[in-house]
Amino acid sequence: DLKQDSEGSNFSALDYAGTIDFTYPKATEWYKGLLKNLLDMGVTCIKTDFGENIHMDALYKGMKPELLNNLYALLYQKAAYEITKDVTGDGIVWARSAWAGCQRYPLHWGGDSCSSWDGMAGSLKGGLHFGLSGFAFWSHDVPGFHTLPNFMNSIVDDDVYMRWTQFGVFSSHIRYHGTNKREPWHYPAIAPMIKKWWKLRYTLIPYIVEQSRKAIASGAPLLQALIFHHPEDKLCWHIDDEYYFGNDFLVAPVMNSENRRDRSEEHTSEL
């Protein structure tokens, strides 16, 4: 069942979608059935987009909207995760919103980031905060989802595309996505270099699998803020532009057109 407004008609928060009432078991099973059709055709992962808000004037079967608002993402992702695991054997979704408990239903990505240096820096900060909140796996749109002011016709600068690809290589999951073409052949000047970084990514797959297993066992994220390894170092509590990728790689992305790291207080004595 779709949720309904106070007059009993189907309530849609968006022009192109209804919002499913996951507090109602029949609605949840109906949704799982739709996903099962896709999974039976060979789909291996469902993107649970949106889910970060609900409308307070809608009626839900099992909960008041003011209590459901944050919980909705958890119920939404749980349903998709469960049916995916039942059909494919692999427990995975590609989720945007999250609340406490959603770490049980990986993975999540950072949403619609701006294709700029600031957007890249903000994505990394968000990912590190996400890891500190208990989420082991996290991704982001490479090389950002949109530009400004041309939101829907975003052409990314080559240097941003290249540096964001490098950031993506050292992330738990990598995906190219945006409001315009993101395939590397649309960026011919840098496509050969992108290919080299992809080869490195595939070389790292055994390491990523090993670190992922450790993350599942321990709860530690793959992208680890420096304080994971250096909690006694006060400076590390303020560094949000580099991270450990698993236990063995210290990653410091370049996030400017000058192709350099710029921190006068760069701290490497104990790293």
Language model feature labels by segment:
Residues 1-264, 269:
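Catalytic-domain carbohydrate-binding cleft regions of carbohydrate-active enzymes
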